[in-house]
Amino acid sequence: MSGAPIRVVGTLGTAQTLAWASSYYLPAMLADPIARDLGVSAPTVYAAFSIAMVASALVGPWAGQAIDRRGGRIVLVSTSLLFASGLGMLAAAQGLWTMVAAWLVMGAAMGSGLYEAAFSSLVRLYGHHARGAITGITLIAGFASTVGWPLSSWMEAQFGWRGACLGWAGLHLVVGLPLNAWLPKAAAVSKPEIPSASNNAHVQSSPPASEPKQQVYATALLAFVFAATWFISTAMATHLPRMLEATGATLTAAVAVGALIGPAQVAGRLLEFGFLRQVHPLLSARLAALAHPAGVAVLLTGGPAMAPVFAILHGAGNGILTIAKGTLPLALFGPQGYGARQGWLMMPARVAQAASPFLFGLALDSWGANALWLSGGIGSAAFGALVVLRARSTAN
């Protein structure tokens, strides 16, 4: 695992599976019963979830800086407690505002306990050798929806949605917390650094505007790439069946095609682990960024018969890009100050993720299948940004 023990990858990957299954993938199974019980609409529940995503964006830089200073173990252990608290609050919610408060706590947990925190923890432990471990984490946690959706559905059927939330909270306390506590302890540092041309620019409590212009430019490009690709990923996750129906596919076919995306994501990550890890992450990111626009072109040209090709291209590209969000900043900027930088890089992405379901839904309502030109255009812009980023990196 490129310098990281398999035990660490397995431990953190399992904890990440639990974290994703009980947060990001929770509304898909519980939004409707929560809405019925609290007397609100399902879109209101999703709006509260979007607020949680914005909260996670605000927490991310702080969590990253804490990991840079103290290592990931203490942050991730604290996050297990936050997840349990948020889920417990959600289980006890009696109305709109108590539900929103619960999702705000969940947002704080997500901002300090999902992939960005896990990647930062690995980089803090293993530095430049963390790439293989980052890939391994995503391979394991890529099954979060496969585990989370059936388990949430079963717990809701057996114990109600409140019991399901309490069940997830209990799992964080008896499984997630011990797993995170099992991570190696990183040596504390007094003040983490973000590498610069002189290698002495310190992490600030604001975006790294004091860095040399080249690094500021590269950081802005990466932030755009991550925001663009998160927008696409969330839009497809939310609207894929309806979008495929707009191209002429039947509902049955759309659901069947949607089932291809998960395996395609895993296949993409295996491709990264087996072959693309030998090349610079910029190359694998560029190939992955092209996958969605290529799938859009195939689907709009060939019609619903080409929907499986679209799903495979989109899924594989998305799987590789998930890894690139961890490996690309490491390759471009190095391990110093990685956590804080990752927090700032992902802040626009989390906001885009929160807005994506609503904005792409509007486009789909207004334009039908032609809304794919929007996602394809955004994906092409992300590819272009990666090309420019490579050119500038090579030039210097």
Q: Residue spans of the language-model regions?
A:
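Extracytoplasmic gate region of multi-pass secondary transporters
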Residues: 27-31, 215-267
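C-terminal transmembrane helical hairpin of 12-TM major facilitator-type secondary transporters
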Residues: 259-265, 279-328
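Helix-loop-helix hairpin linking two adjacent transmembrane segments in secondary transporters
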Residues: 137-188
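Extracytoplasmic
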Residues: 7-42, 59-63, 149, 234-241
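A late C-terminal transmembrane helix in Major Facilitator Superfamily
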Residues: 145, 335-367
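Helix-to-loop junctions at the C-terminal end of transmembrane segments
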Residues: 59-71, 268-281, 364-365
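Conserved MFS/SLC helix-loop-helix module at the cytosolic interface between two early adjacent transmembrane helices
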Residues: 58-96
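Intracellular juxtamembrane helix-capping segments at the cytosolic ends
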Residues: 112-126, 320-333
